[in-house]
Amino acid sequence: MALSDPLSSILYLYHFTDASNLQTIREMGSLFSSAMLRRRGIKDFRPGGNQWSLNADAKSGMDRYVHLCFIDRHPMVHVAKQEGRLERVVYLRVDPGVLRLDGVRYSAGVSNKTGIEVCDIRDAKIDLEVLYERMNWSDPGVYARRRAAEKCEILVPDHVPMKYLEKYFPHG
């Protein structure tokens, strides 16, 4: 039986960041996109992306969005830690009510990748089954679907208001 609103099965979304960014997030009262951080003159912020990724985001306009993921593990975190961009990773748990905000988009993979599909959240074809149900992870097809779903992004324009972040918002 199909859900009338498939997005209602999403319990939380996540945003990973360095623990050193938490104070700035608290002080600003919101989780801001990199474009908004630049506009506000915030320079002391550790991004997860490398310079190539930040440039690609700016060129494609993806820097205007806060990037969220579906699970509290993301393939990019390992590389960001290895390269020293993130020292102590914290996953911020985000209330899925953020999906109802105007302008929220869905990316069927890493959003700044050439040719990746980005659409309005209401038109998203999210593989919720592989994200939230028990499956046979030893099946190569299921494993490939899971790895692909881990890279998908929810894109929130400009900022995620603090009311969508858990009261004790660091997770992990």
What function would you assign to each model-found segment?
Residues 1-172:
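Active-site-proximal loop/hinge segments that shape catalytic or ion-binding/gating pockets
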